[in-house]
Every structure is written in structure tokens, then in C-alpha cells.
Curated annotation (Swiss-Prot):
Positions that bind Mg(2+): D144, N174
Assembly mode: Homodimer.
Name recorded for this polypeptide: 1-deoxy-D-xylulose-5-phosphate synthase
InterPro entries according to UniProt: Dxylulose-5-P_synthase, THDP-binding, Transketo_C/PFOR_II, Transketolase-like_Pyr-bd, Transketolase_BS, Transketolase_C, Transketolase_CS
Needed cofactors: Mg(2+); thiamine diphosphate
Protein source organism: Gloeobacter violaceus (strain ATCC 29082 / PCC 7421)
Function description: Catalyzes the acyloin condensation reaction between C atoms 2 and 3 of pyruvate and glyceraldehyde 3-phosphate to yield 1-deoxy-D-xylulose-5-phosphate (DXP).
Gene name, Swiss-Prot/TrEMBL: dxs
PANTHER family: 1-D-DEOXYXYLULOSE 5-PHOSPHATE SYNTHASE-RELATED (PTHR43322), 1-DEOXY-D-XYLULOSE-5-PHOSPHATE SYNTHASE, CHLOROPLASTIC (PTHR43322:SF5)
Biological process per Gene Ontology, one example term: terpenoid biosynthetic process
Molecular function GO labels: 1-deoxy-D-xylulose-5-phosphate synthase activity; magnesium ion binding; thiamine pyrophosphate binding
Record GO cellular component, one term: cytosol
Pathway info: Metabolic intermediate biosynthesis; 1-deoxy-D-xylulose 5-phosphate biosynthesis; 1-deoxy-D-xylulose 5-phosphate from D-glyceraldehyde 3-phosphate and pyruvate: step 1/1
Residues that coordinate or bind thiamine diphosphate: H72, G113, H114, A115, G145, A146, N174, Y289, E372
Lineage start: Bacteria, Bacillati, Cyanobacteriota, Cyanophyceae, Gloeobacterales
Length: 638
């Protein structure tokens, strides 16, 4: 059977190991060809091809549930569940999503883009099955990176406590080291340790010992020690197995995650076990593509690249430095002058640019794993005792630490500097990764300063502001991708005064107040509006909090019409902040808020999304003209 002939994953149940092996190669070929053309997550999916095929051969996917953590690993799943023909549209506008999405396929029983959610979701599904008396297998597949997340550990702790709830957790361990005892001996020991007859003998023996008059109670502790000794002896293949057994799971593994025969045998055996089962599979990230196997970090995810060389396809023209790069270079320079600066990331050193900080200041760099809550509170502790912590976290991931920002940082006025990369729409990764809520969820927190630069040069200045500000927490948000090409300084940056905006263009018909990435498009929109006789003042707000009301309120009162523009949600966002300030100042003037409506933004290229959302110069000008069309420009001023 060819992959193109597969119309339903249950067809895998009738295939031999050799037939599955041929499908595995076809999946890898399609995976590589597609990601090379569209970009996307490369290494994770290549590493789970055999695991996916073997698991699905042992399941009935019309009935059973498979929950993939994050979705990085799920490209083979997409190909096996009716999406092979459309796989070339991966991460493209109106095409397949880069992550799992319940609305995309009935086989996507759980959607995710943030890590560590799979075990909790799968446990909920297992409990729902039991409540309804259904016959259904539930499996969660989680990577070793996602297992560092506190939510995953919380779920393991709970699931292990529910000894009668059958749930399989598969650890896709794609670390480069592989335990020596992978293979037949491990399979044999798994069978020996979990054999139903032996389990019954052990239970009977314990009962009989405890029932011996007088002696029984004293024997029981000895028997517990005997059980522990046996458990540790039969678990020599993995120290981690002891931990999962103590949590209440039956531990199987580690097994070779690329040996189809062993995988199928182990999965079939695991399905026969009662209660929660933890299966540890060792895989190779990037399996089958030598370039990715040799550089697993770089090829975790890639933009479009040359399949023959693995090198990224060159841009059609030179681009300015990325905001992330400017952030990293500036932070390193500031840290050279301030030994108290500490860099913190939550498993995203390369994405946030903190890998550059680590190269220079390894002793002042901390990667806490997928643990944003811990990252924020640890930063608070560092700040409490005089350090200058810089927490570089994607905007969408900082949402996970909202309580810690309030409880551990803001209430105590601790000077933690939050640097929010990927603010605004990020592009092809879609709704789970867009950073469109930070202005709304941060500005409501008392004492927290929120900044957004109009370009990369202003980001450098705001980095100085953030380091120097010690009255409480402060945050700066900046987008994915290249800057506008603003001239950069190597050092000697002046800080941006807290709460001070700037007027970039003057006009008498309209006041446009823009923040961050929307400042330059608003300036260009003002030029377009001038062609239609509408003369606009444009203000770079710089701060969502505190607002420069000393500048904004007199301008609004004099001009009489206000437009706010932001790359974020309108509900509760920057425009709402300006509107509140106008109302509090007793200024009742027509106000138009341009931003992202109350909906989740789909996946597409960043420029495509900005066009779709009307956040381009022409889109902003069009929205303003349509708003003014019902009100003459010469209307009386407030």
C-alpha cells in the first residue's frame, strides 16, 4: 500500500511490519519535501514516524483517543488521517494548520500549541469514558521537553492516583543518548514484572503474610522492603522508571522508538494492562535526515530550506536585523556594564535570542525548561535580593504565568524586566502562538509599566529603560521578524522617559495614536489620508501604561477626533486605555479603535494576516475613511 492510497488510519491494522516500514519512508519523504517548501517543524515529526504507525496499528481510531502534546510531532498523524493529499498546504493561508485542530479533522481530538497539556486532557477523556461506560483506549504522547512543564507533572501525579482509570502515557524521549538495555531484554523484563499471574501471586502472598497472627503486622514492613527491592532490580534499565512507578504507573521501557516490531508488541501488551501505564520510547529527533540528526536544535523548526544542503533559502533582498537579534545584542552590551543582569528563558534560548547572552555570560543565564510560572517567580526572587532579572518569554507563553506576575512580582513591586518576543501576530503558527493579548492582560496590573517600540532603534532605548527602572515590574513587547531598518547604535543609548509619548506628524483633522509596530503604518496611512484632504496628527504612544495623558488629552480636546491603532486585541487593549483616559478626562470626542476583533486569528504569513486584519497603511486609511464618511471632516470640535 502507498501512503496516497490510505484513506483511513484503521487500514494500518491489516498491514505487515514490512509494509509499515515502506509507509514510514514515504511519510519521511513527504514530510521533508513539504517542510522544505513551506517551513515548519522538522525534527520532531521525523522522529515519531515508526511510533505513530505502530501505535495506530494497535488502535481503532474511530473509537480510541490519541492526544498529541503541543503538535510539533503530529505531521505523520496528519498524513495518516486523511490529509496526505492536502499536506502541501501546511501552514499556508487557507491550508492545513501547523498544529492539531479539532475543527480540521475528527481524528484531532485535542488541539494545542502550548506544551504540557496532553496528559491532563487525556486523563479528562479517560474519566469521561469511564463515566459513560464506554470501551475506548486513551493515549497521551508527550516529549521529554514538554514533560518538564509543571502541568504535565501535576497530571502524572493525579493520573497515578486513579489506579482504576486506564490511561497510556507515551514519553517520546528524543534525547541523543539511548540506554544500553533497549531491546529484547527490556521487553522480557516488562513482561516478567507485569505478568498478571505474578501480580496475583504477589497480592496473595502479601495478604497471607498480613493475616498471620501476631507475626503478620511485623512482617508487612519487611514485605514492603522486599517489594521495593524487586521493583528496583527489575528497573535497572531506567532510573526514571522508578519515579513513574512510585507515582502509580506501570512503567514499560525504554524501548527503541524506531523498531516497528518491538513497538507493536509493546503497545499491544500495554493495552492489556489495567490502570495507568507509562511507556518510555527512545527516538532520534530528525530521524532519516542526516542534516537534522546532526543539528537537532537548529532543525527542530525551519523556514523554507534547500533539501539537498539543509540551508535556508536566501531572502530575495537583504533584510534589516530581527527584533530578537537587536534585543539580544543590546542585552549583552548592557550586561557587560552591569553584573547584576541575569537572563531567564523558559526552554526558548534560540527563539528569544538568549543563546547569545549564554555564550557571553553562562553563569548569569538560566533556562528553566517549559516552566513559565517558575521562571517568573524565580525572577521575582532574584529581584528581591538585588539582581536585575530579564525574563525573555514569548508573549503567548507569558499568559501561563499571569498569577505569578500579579502575586509574586507586582504586589511586591519587584523590578522584574519582562521582554515579550513574538508580540502581535506571528504568522504560520496560528492562534495558539499569536501574541495579541498581552497589552490587555498586562495593563490591568497595578504598578506594571508596559512599553512597545515603534522600531528596533527604539527597542534599544527601551532596553535601557527597562534595566534602569527599579520602582516595580516593567515589560516591553516586540514582534517576530525584521525591523524597519532604523539606524542602530552600538552603545550609548538614552533611555525613553517613562510614560512619555512623541508627536511624529501634525495635522488638525484627526489624532491618530498608535503603539509599537503600528506607528510606521499609521504614519503611512496619514500620508494616504492627506491625499483625500484629511490632515492627521500621529503620536507614537510608546507606553500602553502609563499613558502620556499630558500630551494626549489636550490634543484630543483640540482636534476632536481620535483613532487608536494597535497590533493586539481591541477588547481591553491599548485603544480601550486611551478611551478610558478620554472619558476620565471629560473629553467626549468620536473615537475609533483599530485593532484585532474579538476572535482568534488564523494561520498565514505575517504580512498576509496584517492585510487580512486591516493593519496595513492602506487598511488603516480605508477604515478611517469609512468611519469618517458618515461624519463631515468639518464637524464641530468637542
Amino acid at each position: 500500500m502507498n501512503l496516497s492510497d490510505l484513506s483511513h488510519p484503521n487500514q494500518l491494522r491489516d498491514l505487515s511490519v514490512s509494509q509499515l516500514g515502506r509507509l514510514a519512508q514515504q511519510i519521511r519523504d513527504k514530510h521533508l519535501q513539504t517542510v522544505a517548501a513551506t517551513g515548519g517543524h522538522l525534527g520532531p515529526g521525523l522522529g515519531v514516524v515508526e511510533l505513530t504507525l505502530a501505535l495506530y496499528k494497535t488502535l481503532d481510531l474511530d473509537r480510541d483517543r490519541v492526544v498529541w502534546d503541543v503538535g510539533h510531532q503530529a505531521y505523520p498523524h496528519k498524513m495518516l488521517t486523511g490529509r496526505y493529499a492536502n499536506f502541501h498546504t501546511l501552514r499556508q493561508k487557507d491550508g492545513l494548520a501547523g498544529y492539531l485542530k479539532r475543527a480540521e479533522s475528527p481524528f484531532d481530538c485535542w488541539g494545542a500549541g502550548h506544551a504540557s497539556t496532553s496528559i491532563s486532557a487525556a486523563l479528562g477523556m479517560a474519566l469521561a469514558r469511564d463515566f459513560q461506560g464506554l470501551n475506548r483506549k486513551v493515549v497521551a504522547i508527550i516529549g521529554d521537553g514538554a514533560l518538564t512543564g509543571g502541568m504535565a507533572l501535576e497530571a502524572l501525579n493525579h493520573a497515578g492516583h486513579l489506579s482504576k482509570t486506564n490511561l497510556m502515557v507515551i514519553l517520546n524521549d528524543n534525547e541523543m543518548s539511548i540506554s544500553e538495555n533497549v531491546g529484547g531484554l527490556s521487553l522480557y523484563l516488562n513482561r516478567l514484572r507485569t505478568d498478571p499471574a505474578l501480580r496475583q501471586i504477589r497480592s496473595n502472598l502479601e495478604t497471607q503474610l498480613r493475616n498471620i497472627p501476631l507475626v503478620g503486622p511485623t512482617f508487612s514492613p519487611e514485605f514492603e522492603r522486599f517489594k521495593d527491592t524487586v521493583k528496583y532490580m527489575t528497573m535497572t534499565r531506567s532510573k526514571a522508571g522508578v519515579i513513574f512507578e512510585e507515582l502509580g504507573f506501570t512503567y514499560l521501557g525504554p524501548i527503541d522508538g524506531h523498531n516497528l516490531g518491538d513497538l507493536i508488541e509493546t503497545f499491544e501488551f500495554a493495552h492489556s494492562l489495567p490502570g495507568p501505564v507509562f511507556l518510555h520510547a527512545i527516538t532520534v529527533k530528525g530521524k532519516g535526515y542526516e542534516v537534522a540528526e546532526q543539528n537537532q536544535i537548529k532543525y527542530h523548526a525551519q523556514s523554507a530550506f534547500d533539501l539537498a544542503t539543509g540551508k535556508a533559502k536566501p531572502a530575495s533582498k537583504p533584510t534589516p536585523p530581527a527584533y530578537t537579534s537587536v534585543f539580544a545584542q543590546t542585552l549583552v552590551k548592557l550586561a557587560e556594564q552591569n553584573e547584576k543582569i541575569v537572563g531567564i528563558t523558559a526552554a526558548m534560548p534560540t527563539g528569544t535570542g538568549l543563546d547569545k547572552f549564554k555564550e557571553r555570560f553562562a553563569d548569569r543565564y538560566f533556562d528553566v525548561g517549559i516552566a513559565e510560572q517558575h521562571a517568573v517567580t524565580m525572577a521575582a526572587g532574584l529581584a528581591a535580593d538585588g539582581m536585575r532579572p530579564v525574563a525573555a518569554i514569548y508573549s503567548t507563553f507569558l499568559q501561563r504565568a499571569f498569577d505569578q506576575i500579579i502575586h509574586d512580582v507586582a504586589i511586591q513591586d519587584l523590578p522584574v524586566f519582562f521582554c515579550l518576543d513574538r508580540a502581535g501576530v506571528v504568522g504560520e503558527d496560528g492562534p495558539t502562538h499569536h501574541g495579541v493579548f498581552d497589552l490587555a492582560y498586562l495593563r490591568q496590573i497595578p504598578g506594571l509599566v508596559v512599553m512597545a517600540p515603534k522600531d528596533e532603534a527604539e527597542l534599544q532605548r527601551m532596553m535601557v529603560t527597562g534595566i534602569q527602572y527599579t520602582k516595580g515590574p516593567i515589560a516591553v513587547r516586540y514582534p517576530r521578524g525584521s525591523g524597519s531598518g532604523a539606524p542602530l547604535m552600538a552603545e550609548g543609548w538614552d533611555p525613553v522617559p517613562i510614560g512619555k509619548a512623541e508627536v511624529l506628524r501634525s495635522g488638525d483633522d484627526l489624532l491618530i495614536v498608535a503603539i509599537g509596530t503600528m506607528v510606521h503604518p499609521s504614519l503611512q496611512a496619514a500620508a494616504l489620508l492627506s491625499e483625500h484632504g484629511i490632515d492627521a496628527t500621529v503620536v507614537n504612544a510608546r507606553f500602553a501604561k502609563p499613558l502620556d495623558t499630558e500630551l494626549l488629552l489636550p490634543l484630543a480636546r483640540r482636534i476632536g477626533r481620535v483613532v487608536t491603532v494597535e497590533e493586539g486585541c481591541r477588547m481591553g487593549g491599548f485603544g480601550s486605555a486611551v478611551l478610558e483616559a478620554l472619558m476620565d478626562g471629560g473629553i467626549a470626542v468620536p473615537t475609533l479603535r483599530i485593532g484585532i476583533d474579538d476572535k482568534f486569528v488564523t494561520h498565514a504569513g505575517r504580512s498576509q494576516l496584517l492585510d487580512l486584519l486591516g493593519l496595513t497603511p492602506s487598511g488603516i486609511a480605508k477604515t478611517i475613511r469609512e468611519s469618517l464618511s458618515t461624519e463631515p471632516v468639518s464637524a464641530p470640535r468637542a
